[in-house]
């Protein structure tokens, strides 16, 4: 992004939608971490929501909103589950569609050196979205999925002891 200057005109909205997708992925990671409901997840969520609670003025409200009360309880688990499996996927789907629409309309960002070589009024040579970009993305997704499946099969993450804050 920095080297290609992807955030410059006319692609500001494409860049902003990509940044929002990044924050949504961080939200998936944060909300999904609690779902095993083991001790590590319990205390990590307690610390993570406590950090949100430390924000001046809106912190206490945010803390209570995230936790569903003053403490991390079953209500917090229900909130994070609903957020993780319903709200975040719906928002992500809509934002990915919007991001792809922006990419289709405005094209991909190219290095400044290539843009400088263009004559006034000349357009960049375009590569078709389908099948070129789609096939590259599908191939990359399958490679990442294969690596993730191999890691899960060969190095499974064991669930810890069940979260019991009163023990």
Segments and roles (model prediction):
Residues 2-167:
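Membrane-embedded and interfacial regions of multi-pass energy-transducing membrane proteins
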């Amino acid at each position: 992004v920095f080297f290609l200057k992807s955030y410059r005109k006319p692609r500001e909205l494409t860049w902003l939608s990509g940044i929002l997708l990044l924050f949504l992925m961080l939200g998936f990671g944060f909300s999904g971490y609690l779902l095993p409901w083991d001790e590590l997840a319990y205390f990590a969520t307690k610390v993570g929501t406590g950090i949100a609670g430390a924000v001046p003025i809106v912190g206490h409200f945010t803390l209570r909103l995230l936790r569903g009360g003053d403490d991390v309880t079953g209500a917090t688990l229900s909130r994070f589950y609903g957020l993780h499996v319903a709200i975040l996927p719906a928002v992500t789907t809509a934002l990915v569609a919007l991001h792809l629409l922006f990419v289709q309309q405005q094209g991909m960002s190219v290095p400044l050196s290539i843009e400088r070589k263009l004559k006034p009024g000349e357009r960049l040579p375009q590569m078709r979205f389908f099948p070129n970009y789609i096939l590259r993305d599908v191939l990359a997704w399958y490679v990442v999925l294969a690596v993730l499946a191999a890691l899960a099969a060969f190095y499974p993450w064991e669930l810890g002891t069940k979260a019991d804050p009163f023990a």
